Amino acid sequence: DDILILERDKELGGILNQCIHNGFGLHTFKEELTGPEYAARFVQNAETLGVEIMLDTMVLAVEGHRVTACNTEDGLMMLEGKAIVLAMGCRERTRGAVAIPGDRPSGVFTAGTAQRYINIEGYMVGKRVVILGSGDIGLIMARRMTLEGAKVLACVELMPYCNGLNRNIVQCLNDYDIPLYLSHTVTNVEGLHRVEKVTVAEVGADRKPIPGTEIVFDCDTLLLSVGLIPENELTRK
């Protein structure tokens, strides 16, 4: 049967294209690859099998076995298939999703957005950084920001344990002397045009901040690595 992949980006690979660190492919290919290299292996396999690919194509709706999509070359398209596979990944939780109080200046980024700015677009997002969340993307960005010349003041985690892999704790935090604050969270963001201060406080067993435990960091950037939300809007009809 014929297979068609619809991709809204200009290239296949998704988030892997901005994950330029190594560590991919050990189980599947028995060698260590970067994210783009890992994605390229699967793209090559798909092309070898004759899979049709349409890039820069936006899917607008999925109704039964019918897909409505569009791009600049073909315009609006109505496609039908025997089976439809949704592989849309997820998006990051934002500041609003986790209700961080305080001012709303520039300098607050999700970790994945900062990663794309640095690794793909070539923009440095800040010089003095606090990271909320200790998932793997947060840990990897702590290292990446340090390698690009920024000072990572703290990695802050709400839970009493780190959510990232042990190897990332060692390679991304310990190796660069970046402090990890467990059972802490961000309680305030200050700044007029740009982030100027971030307040961090310890939390109790109820995950609520404990008065009197506040630490204020003078910084210009807050990165959020606070979880992912499935990109499933197309399934709601």
Q: PLM features: residue spans?
A:
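Residues forming the flavin
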Residues: D1-K237
